Design a protein with these regions (language model features):
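Beta-propeller blade repeat segments, especially FG-GAP/WD-type strand-to-loop junctions
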Residues: 22-30, 85-100, 137-151, 192-207, ...
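Beta-propeller blade termini
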Residues: 61-71, 90, 113-123, 142, ...
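Repeat-based blade/solenoid architectures
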Residues: 38-63, 105-117, 157-168, 213-215, ...
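Short, conserved, GDST-rich strand-edge loop motifs in beta-rich repeat architectures
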Residues: 185-212, 316-373, 421-431
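Asp-box/WD-like beta-propeller blade repeats and closely related beta-sheet repeat scaffolds
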Residues: 103-117, 134-172, 182-210, 214-215, ...
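Hydrophobic beta-strand segments that make up the repeating blades of beta-propeller
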Residues: 29, 74-81, 126-133, 180-184, ...
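Bacterial N-terminal signal peptides
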Residues: 3-16
């Protein structure tokens, strides 16, 4: 999983990115982590091991999660760390945050934490917290309701020691309790720490990572009494291993939540939920080809047709970049960053290269993959209805380079959902900008990161320290979206690899909006899986209350609609997970509505 390629930063970026502070923007975003009181810094394992790369270096970074842990109506942030402990920041409601980690008891020092998700698994009205790690096992924290958490992992039946990635809570059998789906990668290290060398013991060499025995995914059924039972084999969800994320949505609208599980090394899988506790792989007849090296995935309606689409970002197919000793691929990458190629070798070879077809097909066959099931780049699956999709990433303008995490939201409140993509490698010393893909409203996107305050990064493109005598570049890994200050505009927060996070305060001109915080009664209390549709004149919009997703991240579960200049909403239709339909007529705009699931 670790990439030990070495590349140099692009000259066209260096010139504009070494100023200590990016200029203030009149519109767009403004980076304000320091001003907001967020002092967290993600530290990676080389700090523990000195400046020497070890195979156990986990360069996929750590995640973050958003949730209102203290029920004060404000979204709080939990940052994950590889070294030195995680951090929980309480939202004070005035644009600032306070570190409450020690009181809450959720630091988990000594672990290599990866991702986390807030969820009220026992429906007691308080958001609990589940954390995945690659050292010492995953942890379920029960929220006591007094600002503190209790480790109930063993009692809940969720003890798992391995190399876990994303975890999502969703109610797959519609019994009103949130079940847990856990993604895992491969056994690329042991769970042993060598105190003599300071190393987290790994495999012998990097080449073992793609073929090492895989850790399969897990599905835990919520028994409704605070415990869980492993139902993976019965459900048919072991998967193919090397999964780093999962997207949850009812793609065919049959009333049961389905799963898309991307793979870091191979084809992804769309699982159809039968409604009887089992899942079936329907990828071939629904999505067709899937990205070979997918990292993050997100569900949203990109074209405003009222149907939920699926976006998958593929980082590992860009590994051709920087593999040449002279780093000549840097300019090629800049020139071809929005193109898709025929293999992970990128533009260095194509179908005219002698032996290309035979060699590439043989390579994937050796890895147990069918070349004809793969594509090499991002994938945007447009939902055509009736369980059918068509892939549109390139024409939509969403083919990007070095993508990791993806977060979506209507950042300028114009009625169209935009996309934020974290990018770059950091190690090996290669900077690539984050992407802010603004929705044009016609099914296409344009990158406005530089124009709207996302790029260049505050403090320049390099980190303070060096690794192996060379400067390390900044690199964002995961991102979340939420209206942290309650002004109807969505902020973006990232967790950056071996660096400080970004807190992008929204400075777009104020426009009309409406928000809904949903509470389930018959359905799960978090209302995960609820679909909300809005009609305003001839405009229809759809949002889903989603669990974690996008790559090691959990964004807000508050449903946000930007309205642009529209002065009223005609109606809202809410489809709750257990099938109850609810309609709201002409709700007030520019406010947050609290909505409870009706009895019927």
């Amino acid at each position: 999983m670790t990439k030990l390629t070495v590349a140099v930063a692009a000259a066209w970026l260096i010139a504009g990115c070494q100023h200590p502070k990016a200029p203030a923007r009149v519109t767009g975003f403004q980076e304000r982590a320091q001003e907001a009181g967020i002092a967290f810094r993600m530290h990676d394992l080389p700090k523990e091991q000195g400046e020497q790369f070890h195979i156990n270096l986990y360069d996929h970074g750590s995640g973050l999660a958003v949730g209102d842990y203290d029920n004060d109506g404000r979204e709080d942030i939990y940052f994950l760390n590889q070294l030195g402990g995680n951090a929980l920041y309480r939202n004070m409601g005035d644009g600032s945050f306070v570190d409450v980690t020690a009181k809450a008891g959720v630091a988990l020092p000594g672990r290599v934490s990866v991702a986390a998700t807030f969820a009220d698994y026992d429906n007691d009205g308080w958001e609990d917290l589940y954390v995945t790690t690659t050292r010492g096992g995953n942890v379920l924290f029960h929220n006591r309701g007094d600002g503190t958490f209790e480790d109930v992992t063993a009692a809940a039946g969720l003890r798992y020691v391995g190399h876990s990635q994303a975890a999502v809570f969703f109610d797959y059998d519609n019994d009103g309790y949130l079940d847990l789906f856990l993604t895992n990668t491969g056994r690329w290290t042991t769970d042993t720490f060598d105190s003599a060398t300071g190393a987290y013991v790994g495999k012998a060499d990097l080449g073992t990572t793609m073929t090492t025995p895989r850790e399969f995914n897990r599905l835990y059924h919520n028994n409704g009494d605070g415990t869980f039972t492993d139902q993976t084999d019965r459900a048919g969800l072991r998967g193919r291993g090397w999964a780093g994320d999962v997207a949850v949505f009812d793609y065919d609208e049959d009333g049961f939540l389905d799963l898309f599980v991307p793979s870091m090394f191979g084809r992804g899988q769309l699982y159809h939920n039968s409604g009887h506790g089992t899942f079936t792989d329907v990828t071939a007849q629904t999505l067709g080809r899937t990205p070979y090296g997918a990292i993050g995935s997100k569900v949203f309606d990109y074209d405003g047709d009222g149907r939920l689409d699926l976006f998958v970002v593929d980082m590992h197919s860009d590994m051709w970049m920087g593999l040449d000793a002279q780093h000549l691929s840097l300019e090629t990458a800049r020139r071809t960053q929005h193109q898709r190629f025929l293999s992970p070798l990128g533009p260095t070879v194509d179908e005219t290269t002698p032996g290309f077809t035979t060699t590439v097909r043989a390579l994937f066959a050796k890895l147990g993959e069918d070349y004809n099931t793969l594509l090499f780049g991002n994938a945007l699956y447009r939902n055509l209805g009736q369980g059918r999709f068509t892939e549109t990433a390139a024409p939509a303008g969403l083919e990007t380079l070095w993508p990791w995490g993806v977060a979506t939201g209507d950042f300028d409140d114009d009625g169209n959902e935009d996309v934020f993509i974290t990018s770059g490698m950091g190690y090996p010393f290669y900077y690539w900008p984050n992407q802010l893909m603004m929705n044009n409203g016609d099914g296409t996107f344009r990158d406005q990161a530089a124009a709207l305050g996302i790029e260049p990064p505050t403090g320049g493109i390099y980190l303070e320290e060096k690794v192996g005598g060379k400067p390390a570049a900044r690199s964002s890994r995961s991102a979340v979206v939420a209206d942290f200050d309650g002004d109807g505009r969505l902020e973006i927060v990232t967790n950056n690899f071996n660096g400080r996070p970004y807190y992008f305060a929204n400075r777009f001109p104020r426009r009309n909006y409406v928000e809904f915080r949903l509470t389930g009664t018959k359905s799960n209390r978090d209302a995960i899986g609820t679909v909300v549709r809005l009609w305003a004149g001839n405009k229809v919009m759809v949002r889903q209350v989603s669990p974690a997703g996008g790559y090691l991240a959990q964004s807000t579960r508050v449903v946000h609609f930007g309205l642009g200049d529209r002065s009223q909403v005609d109606s809202i239709a809410i489809r709750w997970p257990r099938g109850i339909m609810q309609t709201l007529r002409n709700p007030a705009i520019n406010t947050l509505h609290e909505v409870r699931e009706p009895a019927r």
